[in-house]
Amino acid sequence: MATKKDPLGVQPKPITGSRTSLPRTHEIKARALAATRLLEDGWVEHDPQRAIIDDLIDYRDQTIGRLGNPLSGRRLSQFSQAGKSKTMAQLKAELAALRVALGLPPNPYQVVIVELDRRLNLKGFYQEVLRKLDDDFWDADVSAKVLENRIADFVRKLDVELLIADEVQHLRRKANDANEVTDRLKVFLDRGIVPLVLVGDEDSVPFFRANGKLAARLGNPLELAPLNPKGSVADAKLFKKFCGALDEGLMKNRIFPSSSMLTSNKTLDALLEVSSGHVGRVARLLSVAAPAAVRRGAACVEPYDLSRATREFAIGAGWLVTDPFSIAAP
């Protein structure tokens, strides 16, 4: 009986380690966890993300001492898993470090990040902001206007410098509650309640286009565009530098004893195809592949692990429909 061909091609075979996971020893579990934390929570310096952080720090500086006056906001739209949320987390960490460097006490409320939900109405949005501000009465049965005024009071009392609303694409839906939240975001800026940064995926672009009055208050859009190594030498260098930094981090943190050769031309080409040039997606793919490589006792992340991660994660996430780490079936 003929063997059925794999439509994605012939997968590479493991070079080191086992094909499947080994018994979970303490050492294996510790290294797999370290790999996950490094790749999901760690920061790799990347020029386009640095530019966004610098722009938002400038925005913070421009708005200090201006509460109660009309404020502009900022917005960032880019594909899912492109690195937006990690950039916002790094912004928060760097502003906290700047505060300490100035001799000021730490302020956990300096930057407040709220993730919007597709079901969130205006009152729910306000309550989520107040919950992040540790308001004991965030869920009190009061009007949205009262909640809005409480937010203004808490922002001043807690010295909030930025409010970041993530996943704003959920406001794109055609519903009264979504429109109400959108209208009040404009009021947030007009009243100078708090400096506001709106972050969303590619679906947020039509939302901003359809809400011109809000978009006009948000200045020039911040861009975290995908790299184009095939068409730009500078982008090729940035992409290789980022992948190399991930490889170095895996060795420096003693997760693997050997290089994963992420900067070889063949691997770079495959990573580019999987990620479409979004470095955040490269890190996300590695966050799936690296722990799996640890668990099977491999000396590094191999094409076998990257192929499995592509098939089991990236294709399912809708990033692509092929596996560039596999060899096309004859």
Regions found by a protein language model. Give the residues of each.
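Walker A/P-loop nucleotide-binding motif
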Residues: 68-90
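Walker A/P-loop-proximal flanking segment of P-loop NTPase domains
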Residues: 1-73
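Conserved NTP-binding/hydrolysis module of P-loop NTPases
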Residues: 111, 116-138
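Conserved P-loop NTPase "ATPase switch" module shared by AAA+ and STAND
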Residues: 154-177
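C-terminal alpha-helical "lid" subdomain
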Residues: 1-24, 109, 240-330
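The catalytic "switch" region of P-loop NTPases
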Residues: 170-174, 183-266
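Post-Walker A helix-loop "phosphate-sensing" segment adjacent to the P-loop in P-loop NTPases
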Residues: 94-105, 135-137
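Conserved catalytic segments around the Walker B and adjacent sensor/switch elements
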Residues: 99-117
